[in-house]
């Protein structure tokens, strides 16, 4: 049976942590900041951890 291919779109967007979690950049950060509060903009910086219910699906896409 051939090896499963990694979904390249997912591999470019998500990183698997050492403990098996998945982190990604926040959405809603490319434009239209004038409509967001200072608190919203501050909280959108950096990365976020994916919730437990969707991690299994994304591990299948990433083959990890």
UniProtKB/Swiss-Prot annotation:
Keywords: Ribonucleoprotein, Ribosomal protein
GO CC annotation: cytosolic large ribosomal subunit
GO MF annotations in UniProt: structural constituent of ribosome
One GO BP annotation of this record: translation
Family matches, as Pfam families: Ribosomal_L35p
SUPFAM superfamilies: L35p-like (SSF143034)
PANTHER family recorded: 54S RIBOSOMAL PROTEIN BL35M, LARGE RIBOSOMAL SUBUNIT PROTEIN BL35M
Family, similarity comment: Belongs to the bacterial ribosomal protein bL35 family.
NCBIfam families hit by this protein: rpmI_bact
HAMAP family (UniProt xref): Ribosomal_bL35
Full protein name: Large ribosomal subunit protein bL35
Protein species of origin: Levilactobacillus brevis (strain ATCC 367 / BCRC 12310 / CIP 105137 / JCM 1170 / LMG 11437 / NCIMB 947 / NCTC 947) (Lactobacillus brevis)
């Amino acid at each position: 049976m051939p090896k499963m291919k990694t979904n390249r779109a997912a591999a470019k967007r998500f990183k698997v942590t050492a403990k098996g979690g998945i982190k990604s950049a926040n959405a809603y950060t490319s434009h239209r900041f004038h409509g967001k509060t200072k608190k919203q903009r501050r909280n959108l910086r950096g990365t976020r951890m994916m919730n437990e219910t969707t991690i299994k699906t994304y591990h299948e896409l990433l083959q990890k």
